Amino acid sequence: MRILMVTPCYYPVKGGTETTVRNLAITLNKNGIKTDVMAFNMDQNRKPRWRGKTEKIDGITVYRIPALRWLPIHSRRITAGVNFVPGRFIDTLKNYDIIHFHELDFSFPFFSFPIKKPKIIHSHGIFYDFFKMHHISRFLLKHLAHLYIVISKKMKKEFMALGISENKIVHLPNSVDTDLFAPKGQKEDNLLLFVGRISGGKGLHILIKSLQHIKERIRLIVIGPPDQNVNYFQNILKMIEEENQRGEHEIKYLGAKDQNELVKWYQKASLFILPSFGEGFPVTVLEALACETPVIATPVGGIPEIIKNNETGILISPNNPKSLAEAIQHLLENKDLRYKMGREGRKYVMKWHSIENVCKKLCAIYEQLIDANKFG
């Protein structure tokens, strides 16, 4: 079986989807499923490069497509129009048994429509309101794939509401490398960790505001690349500077980090905080739990499917710095409870979200799709 995973951006671009695609491709290849990757040619800051190339990463063939038009609207996941994909790259698709599209960029599905191969659209975050309002985008979503993979049960309901048949939708949760993301060493008391794109939707500003309501001196580590909203990023840097000048807490922004550096902070942190306004099924929460780090997060997207309230973490309402502060204070004052939550979180991830278990399910999906369709 030969699989081509197609995604707008790929490693070394850092992000939840990019990490997921890379881990799946590596693990599938280890298990004897030949898997390669096709993506637009972007630098680490997602700026387009105008020339294509083919390279080997982790033993995987990566086809880099010239990014001839990269015009995001509403979200980095939904582009304005369809980016041009040269014919020589589309011809490459004929060499694979299944074309597995990641994210909701329609460039590759649109230009690959004539290729008679089984196709999957794998959504890592649904923008239900966008597709409900934009009829052409909704039409494309419904007709450019034979199967749809969603990462949360909530997302499955949203796809069905957009008119996609339930028997074409498969729920496959995100995964984590539980060998890499594993507990190690001692936790550092009062060390909080935020990992994610520095965007308004992730709610980092809420976390920074919450520190004013916490008694103990906090050390907050912030990791993640800036979003396209430069103003928000600059405001965050200003908030960090002002909080550090107050002297009651310490905040460090470290930028984007690769997995080998990132895991060290998960292992050290007392708590992982994600006060998002909206999510798909955040890999960062799985990474934290795999390292036995309890999570405080908001009940948005697929998060309630991961976090069992008061068992593996605490769920708090969005846009509520005081409520967040109370949850942080409660867990910092209860070390035994933190450790118990951490152990339960690791058990949960090992059972349901290890990369090995998820890849077994994905292989079964591939086999069923091939058996159900006849393609010449």
Could you say what each language-model-derived stretch is?
Residues 49, 221-248, 260-261, 337:
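Short, structured helix-loop element that forms part of the nucleotide-activated donor/catalytic region
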Residues 154, 175:
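Carbohydrate-associated surface elements
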Residues 277:
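Aromatic "clamp/platform" in nucleotide-sugar-dependent glycosyltransferases that forms part
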Residues 309-310, 314-321, 330-335:
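Conserved acidic donor-binding segment of nucleotide-sugar-dependent glycosyltransferases
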Residues 101-107, 123:
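Short His-centered aromatic/hydrophobic patch
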Residues 294-297:
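Short hydrophobic beta-strand element within catalytic cores of glycosyltransferases
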Residues 256, 264-269:
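Short alpha-helical donor nucleotide-sugar binding micro-motif in glycosyltransferases
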Residues 19, 190, 197-213, 234, ...:
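A conserved mid-protein helix/loop that constitutes part of the nucleotide-sugar donor-binding site
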